[in-house]
From Swiss-Prot:
GO BP terms: tRNA N2-guanine methylation
PROSITE patterns: SAM_MT_TRM1 (PS51626)
Record's protein name: tRNA (guanine(26)-N(2))-dimethyltransferase
Binding site for S-adenosyl-L-methionine: R39, R65, D83, D109, A110
Enzyme's top EC category: transferase
Chain's role: Dimethylates a single guanine residue at position 26 of a number of tRNAs using S-adenosyl-L-methionine as donor of the methyl groups.
């Protein structure tokens, strides 16, 4: 295997040479440099939550995510890395040694490993190529009470409903076409995890959920207990969208998307604490503001255009705030904003 030495965050590691293999997708071991932000934000989250953690990454690739957790978060007591590829497992060992990190390395099927680690892990991070859905049940088997589950999904087109049959088959949900389809896709992922959690008698509380171009990412605190699982399911339901109207419901109809997570997508306080580290602080600041608004949707400026002309985002936010409506930009659309008011009230404030 042809390798190159790379650096990300505070670690160095070997990865397949993309020039030799043509693309990252053709290489014998997968490493995607475009996921650096994903990994960095995850490190900041663990650093914020505290130490002494048993962390498992069952789809490790080069091992860079787990190694960064160990080196940068200062929160890892035991690190378990795994990949079904024998080449990947050997490369993980090489990268652990390069960084002086102690870790257990396995060459196994991810679900088999997670079942073997029953009730062992404080953190399970599912970072697959495609959908995390096949691994979520097993992840809950591996998690301890009061643990953390992180999941990345790159099958964004499925989650936003572009492929309805696959969305129903994979996530047991339907997502309609709306101006805020990105948010529905993210809530689709979190809602799926919440329902799987409940089937394993776990509740979830999202700490950080976001969209970044080609993927969705969520990290949820989990707690064991049937009663808490029942309570968490109160945050699962449907979003109804018709022109000029948005509402939530517990029963589906021909205009609804769901079942989705209707509750908060993250914790504003944790985002504020993460931002203090000075890395991706602007992005974390946007998330902090978004998470403080309960509505499970956002608005887009073209929805309020008159003769094809709509206010700028800055103008819209100013008008809303002058009308006493709390509003903030959203990271999910450059022309989008969240507001603690209904469509009619927002429209009256803008015009």
């Amino acid at each position: 295997m042809n390798l190159v030495l790379r650096r990300e965050g505070a670690v160095q590691f070997y990865a397949p040479d993309p020039q030799r293999y043509g693309s990252i997708y053709s290489a014998p071991v997968f490493y995607n440099p475009a996921m650096e932000k994903n990994r960095t934000l995850s490190v900041l989250l663990l650093r914020t939550l505290g130490g002494g953690l048993t962390v498992c990454e069952p789809l490790s690739g080069t091992g860079v995510r787990g190694i960064r957790y160990a080196v940068e978060s200062k929160a890892v007591a035991r690190l378990v890395l795994n990949d079904i590829s024998r080449d990947a497992a050997e490369l993980i060992k090489k990268n652990l040694e390069l960084n002086g990190v102690d870790g257990e390395v396995y060459n196994d099927d991810a679900n088999v490993l997670l079942h073997r680690l029953k009730n062992v892990c404080d953190v399970v991070d599912i970072d697959p190529f495609g959908s995390p859905a096949p691994y979520i049940h097993a992840a809950f088997r591996a998690l301890r009470d009061e643990g953390l589950l992180c999941a990345t999904a790159t099958d964004t087109a499925v989650l936003v409903g572009r492929y309805p049959r696959k969305c129903l088959r994979r996530y047991w949900s339907t997502v309609r076409k709306t101006p805020f389809y990105i948010e529905l896709g993210l809530r689709n992922l979190v809602g799926f995890i919440a329902r799987v959690a409940a089937s394993e008698d776990f509740s979830i509380r999202p700490l950080m959920s976001y969209w970044e171009g080609h993927y969705f990412r969520t990290c949820v605190a989990v707690a064991r207990g049937a009663r808490d699982a029942d309570d968490a399911l109160q945050n699962v339901g449907y979003v109804v969208y018709r022109r000029g109207m948005r509402q939530t419901t517990q029963l589906p109809d021909e205009s609804s998307s769901g079942p989705l997570w209707l509750g908060p997508l993250g914790d504003p306080l944790i985002m504020h604490q993460m931002a203090q580290h000075g890395v991706y602080s602007d992005f974390l600041g946007v998330l902090e503001q978004e998470y403080s608004i309960e509505a499970p949707w956002h608005y887009r400026l073209p929805e309020f255009a008159v003769e094809g002309v709509s206010p700028t985002l800055a103008e819209a936010l100013d008008l809303l705030r002058r009308s006493g409506i709390y509003a903030t930009a959203t990271h999910m659309a450059k022309d989008g904003f969240k507001a603690d008011a209904g469509y009619g009230e927002v429209k009256r404030a803008l015009f």
